[in-house]
Amino acid sequence: MGKAKVPASKRAPSSPVAKPGPVKTLTRKKNKKKKRFWKSKAREVSKKPASGPGAVVRPPKAPEDFSQNWKALQEWLLKQKSQAPEKPLVISQMGSKKKPKIIQQNKKETSPQVKGEEMPAGKDQEASRGSVPSGSKMDRRAPVPRTKASGTEHNKKGTKERTNGDIVPERGDIEHKKRKAKEAAPAPPTEEDIWFDDVDPADIEAAIGPEAAKIARKQLGQSEGSVSLSLVKEQAFGGLTRALALDCEMVGVGPKGEESMAARVSIVNQYGKCVYDKYVKPTEPVTDYRTAVSGIRPENLKQGEELEVVQKEVAEMLKGRILVGHALHNDLKVLFLDHPKKKIRDTQKYKPFKSQVKSGRPSLRLLSEKILGLQVQQAEHCSIQDAQAAMRLYVMVKKEWESMARDRRPLLTAPDHCSDDA
């Protein structure tokens, strides 16, 4: 059987047998249209504002953009002012290291507020970026209101901060002043500084000070309280001895306080040991206690002994013994007592002492300083110390004094009562 032939006019138009010329022209037209479309799209994109991170920010042009940005800035500033007093910062508690941390916290607090107030995309967004940057850019460019933290950020070390009108120096200034004060304070003297010899410690104390005097006394073998220690013989007999030293402290009675009355009576033995010490009740109203010299105060006499009792006790102790003292006629007078002339050893009347200190009526203070090398009666007098000093003077020249007393016994005359107290 033979195959039937299909007519050419009934073929599909899209068959590959179509003419090549017109097909090429169609594809070129389509390509041109595509190129035009993409070019127009690129132009539209270029006209739109850039939103990428590297996009150039342009200033706003429309007046509406200006007004919207101004409102956003005003609202942001009001919120900052309302939040500022909630957390007051104390300048004294802010160190130089803590200040940057506080500023960073303020930045973190402001950034979310600005983010919430971002303007819509497009021209409004362009305007907002031009005047008030949004997001992270706000932290860098926006004018942060001046707070205590930001104000003190620029302060450097050594500057002074002002709080309520008072200038508070920083720690560096205080440490510098303390260092200057320490450098200015003179160092106390040492043993190497006190190198000179044969100088009285009292003179050193007056010239240099008490610290230097202590060192000088230490070098001389003296210590504090050396006056009382040198006048008393340690580990010696503490009872009555052949010689006893007497001294009395007196107060003033009468209209002007010129008359004297016994207020304290002290007796020491030959070794400086105190064997008797009592306050005496006044028989008349005291008009002058003479505290600066006598050391007697009203409370001392309240618990005192009666004068008659003291008289009997002292007379019993002195009976048959050598009585030593300084200006003894005054002490015996206020006690209303008497003692044999040959048994009295008065340091004020001993001629070798007078010639040694070049004084016709030397005081006990002068004799102690020149002969014993001790300072007594510097302030308030003490009857025990005065009796010890008199006994010490007597013991130093006891042999010579007793030999002179034996030689002069046949030539003794009546006692001289005209001498006064030194």
Swiss-Prot record:
Hydrolase found in the keyword field: yes
Gene Ontology MF terms: 3'-5' exonuclease activity; double-stranded DNA binding; endonuclease activity; exonuclease activity; RNA binding; single-stranded DNA binding
GO biological process: DNA catabolic process; DNA repair; regulation of DNA-templated transcription; RNA processing; rRNA processing
Keyword Isomerase: no
Domain of life: Eukaryota
SMART domains: EXOIII
Per UniProt, location of the Glycyl lysine isopeptide (Lys-Gly) (interchain with G-Cter in SUMO2) cross-link in this chain: 115
Annotated segments matching region Disordered: 1-194
Annotated Basic and acidic residues bias: 106-127, 151-176
Pfam families reported for this sequence: RNase_T (PF00929)
EC number: 3.1.-.-
Compositional bias annotation for Basic residues: 26-40
Sequence positions bearing Phosphoserine: 15, 96, 111
InterPro entries membership: Exonuclease_RNaseT/DNA_pol3 (IPR013520), REX4_DEDDh_dom (IPR037431), REXO1/3/4-like (IPR047021), RNaseH-like_sf (IPR012337), RNaseH_sf (IPR036397)
Predominant subcellular localization, coarse grouping: nucleus
Protein location: Nucleus, Nucleolus
Alphabetical UniProt keywords: Exonuclease, Hydrolase, Isopeptide bond, Nuclease, Nucleus, Phosphoprotein, Ubl conjugation
One GO cellular component term: nucleus
Domain Exonuclease as annotated: residue spans: 243-394
Subunit structure as annotated in this protein's UniProt entry: Can bind ESR1 and ESR2. This interaction is abrogated by estrogen and augmented by tamoxifen treatment.
Homology family: Belongs to the REXO4 family.
UniProt protein name: RNA exonuclease 4
Gene: REXO4
